[in-house]
Structure formats: structure tokens, C-alpha cells
Amino acid sequence: MNSDILLFISFLVVYFVLPTTVKSQNLVKNSGFEVSYNLPEYWIITGPVISMQPQTAVDEQIRFEGKHSLKMESNNPNCHGRAVQTIDIKGNQTWFFKTRFRVKEVKSIDKSVLIRIKWFNGDKNIGYNYVYEIAGESDGWFLATNKIKPVTEATSAEISLEFRWSTGTIWWDDISMEPCPDEPARNVKVGTFHFRPPGPTVEKNVSLMGKLLDEAGAAGCGIVCLGEGWPTCNTNIGMKKHEANSIGGSASKMMAEKAKKYRMYIVSGLYNWDNDTLYNIAVLYNRQGNIQDIYKKVQLPDSETEAGAVPGNTFPVFITDFGKIGILICYDNFYPEVARNLALNGAEILFNPIWGDIRGTDSDVEKTIARSRAIDNGVYFVNSIYDGNTLIINPAGEILQETNKQGTLITATIDLNYNPPWDWVGNAGRGVWKDIWKKDRRVDLYGNPIKYDSPVLDKDKKDK
């Protein structure tokens, strides 16, 4: 494992495992339901419709720690009940929330287990967050955590532990909400090229792309995106067998050298023959100049299948030293499921080497689609296009940089912790969409994302 990935893992440990350097101060009263007489003190048991509430009581038999847990049990598939507690907070303070829960005969945790924190200014509901980071633990218990920055004007928070739309049983225990340090910015300078290699030879294309990579390196880019199948563009070679159409060819070697020289990640489209099997791929070169990983294009148009190309079958998400990225190639972007699977698997930036998109009658159709992919999934979106506009877009769908000028590099310094609340997302006030869509998504209907197993690369190409 290389030093860049170790650095990112160290960040995750500090961010998630060691969330506080502030003195521990749990604001939740009766956090383990120890002070209880059938129903827990300081908690209000309620729900939208009284007759639809699950049976709720303190349980002495099953608990995470201490003597008690809170048990909600239902034989009504349309049940909806809550345990609610309101605490006083400071709106300019970041908070670390956690709770443990376990379930029995509940079909979908995503659908039926909801942890919501509403923010109030006086009696006015001014926003909310979902707690959606859930990890399995031993003995059947789950740990739900989030590091949350409330709406600035908030003076109190309503913690709501909810069981809804299912039969079965849920137990709650070990709830806490404590002040913690603010999230540090996670800045990275991203770059992308609007460049259709002119040919007529691979050598000329490689030389010109090398000069553009020198420009990106001099600009201090942390990662840069290149176009689809660029080495053989305008050469009459296309996807045919050729040294340039391989991860060991001249174009790939040049990119590896530039990545190492400038300690810069490179995302590049490439055609790749593996013996007699042809793939349309995107390669991620790391800062050491090694091929870190490869994405194989999933959605192939007829022109590529007729050339003999074979599709990939997974949606990989790659860990860099600044965050997680996903890649989709050209026709992949015509299908919203590709971007959605990458986002569900954790991608924070989507890179898109793309020839073009000429659907519809609007000449700016690719802008609309690219902005939609960013907004729908709460991610940054960066393309490198031949026919259209090369774009850098933030999770709010705002175009940070764009160009359609041949041979141009555009850059933007982005913060991967950018996670703004939006008005009228969900059912009340302001919501953080990046959190909300992952929780409200009906996984019981749509299914889980397709998981990814990293391919085994040749030993000399894999990070040491």
C-alpha cells in the first residue's frame, strides 16, 4: 500500500474514529434508557398517527450496555413511531452524533430505520439532517454515526429515533451527541483538458498531450482528466490492435512519467487490448507514476461492439490521498444508473472522458446532463469532451469552469467537504441532499449498488 493511500486512511481514522479533541460532553439525557419506568425519562414516545405507533417500552433483556435499551415492536407493516428528545445547542458548533441499534425481522434498514436531527430556532423548524453512516458491529448491533454542522441559526436540536413501515422489532441504546472540531477543508486542485488530438500520427498526439500535462503539472493540479481513447484519435487506427492501444504502450508510458514527475494523479481514457480481448478503459495513474487501477466501460455503443470491444461489469471507486473518485466513459453517462452506482459506492468526484453527447435538440444538452449527474448524486463532476463543453461542476450543479476552446486546460480548487443545505429538500426546512438521498432512496425497490472487486494488475504496475 503506497504512502498516498496510507495518508487518506489516516485521515479517515482521525475524522471518523477519533472525532473529538474537545472534552467529552454528551448532551443527551438518559442516553442508555437507564432512568426508566416502563417508558424512558426525558424521551417522548410519539408518531404521526397514534394508532400506527409500534409498541414501545424499556427492555431489560436485550441491550448494548448497561441495564436497559428501548424496544419498538410492530406487527403492522405501515407502523411509524418515534422516540424524541430535544437538547439545547450552539448552531456554530459541529456535533458528533452516534447511536447503536439492532433489528429483528425488519426487511430493510434503509427503509424502516430512520435517525433524524431537526434544527430549531425557538419553535421554528429551520432544517434537518439524517444520520446515514451505518456500520455493522458484533452481537447483532449496528453503529450509526454522523459528524454534523447544524444550520447556523439553530438554538436547539430534536433527536428522533424512528421505526417505520415494517413489522418486526428494533432496539435502541447508547445515544450521544457531543461537540467536536469543525471539519477541515479537503481541498484538491482538479484539472481537465478540452483537447481533440489532431493526428495524423500517434506520436504527434502523444507529444501534444505531453505538453498539456506539463501545463497541468506546472499549474499544480492534484488530478487531471484526459479524453476518451485519445492516443489514436484522428489517426485512422481507432480501436485496432496497436501499441498505443494498450496499458503498456507509448501513450501510457508517457502518462506514467508525467504523473511521477509532477506527483499528479491522471485519469485517462484508453483503448486496451488484453491478448485478443478489447476493452474501452480509463486508467488511474497515481502520484508515483504507477497504474493504480482500471475502469472498464460498462455501456458500449454499437460502434464499439462491432469493433470487438467487451464491456466491463462493475463500478469501481478508487481511493486517492484526497478522497474517493469514480470514472465513467462517454456512453456510460447516458445511463443515470452508472453515476448513481458510483456515488452509492462512495465516489465524491466523477470523472468522465467523453467523445460527446448529441441527444435532443439543445446544443447544450451535455451541460444539462452533467449538471444533473452532479446534483442527483451530491458529487463533483468533471468531464473531458471533444464535441461540446468541458466542465467542472460542483455538487450544487454550479459550473465552476467550462471551455470549448481546443487545447485548453481548465482548473478549479474544490473542497470535498462542501456539503451545503438546500431549501425545500425533503419534507421540512433545509436539508443536506448528500445525506438525504442516500437515506430516503428505496433500496428495497431499487436494490443495492453493484459492488466492486479490484482487479489484479501485473506486479510491476501495482503499487508497492
Indicate where each model-derived feature is located.
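Bacterial Sec-dependent N-terminal signal peptides
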Residues: 1-25
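Short beta-strand segments enriched in small/hydrophobic residues
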Residues: 185-199, 203
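Cys-nucleophile CN-hydrolase/nitrilase-fold catalytic domain and related Cys-dependent amidase chemistry
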Residues: 214-287, 359-371, 376-377
